[in-house]
From Swiss-Prot:
Keywords, sorted A to Z: Phosphoprotein
Organism in which the protein naturally occurs: Mus musculus
Membrane recorded as keyword: no
Record-stated family: Belongs to the UPF0235 family.
Renumbered residue ranges of the record's region Disordered: 1-32
Protein name: UPF0235 protein C15orf40 homolog
Length: 126
């Protein structure tokens, strides 16, 4: 009996290890299709656009546009394209059109490490 119990716990441990590794990367990840995604906590109605904080769950971004008729969403994509040195068409809102918790997808070929480094640099400017 002990062998069976040990065998099942090994199987569980092996499946848990890969699952816990990706969330440790933080708010910037790669989706199954290979695109880089960024979890955003939007703060619309601010005086100026800025990356306010980087947490393990999301990147806090202040948006200088009102949260009505998608203005803040468009401004968020424009601002992130400027910060990340990408074309505006390469930064698209994937989820969260009417929520403060958003997911932005980057269609350009870049790595999560490069994106995180640029976001950290922008956050330190404030």
């Amino acid at each position: 009996m002990p062998k069976k119990a040990g065998a099942t716990s090994k199987g569980k441990n092996q499946t848990k290890e890969p699952e816990t590794a990706p969330p440790a990367a933080g708010p910037v990840a790669t989706d199954p299709k290979g695109f880089v995604t960024i979890a955003i906590h939007a703060k619309p109605g601010s005086r100026q656009n800025a990356v306010t904080d980087l947490s393990t769950e999301a990147v806090g971004v202040a948006i200088a546009a009102p949260p009505s008729e998608g203005e803040a969403n468009a401004e968020l994509c424009r601002y992130l394209s400027k910060v990340l040195d990408l074309r505006k068409s390469d930064v698209v809102l994937d989820k969260g059109g009417k929520s403060r918790e958003k997911v932005v997808k980057l269609l350009a070929s870049t790595t999560p490490e490069e994106v995180l480094e640029k976001l950290k640099t922008e956050a330190e400017k404030k």
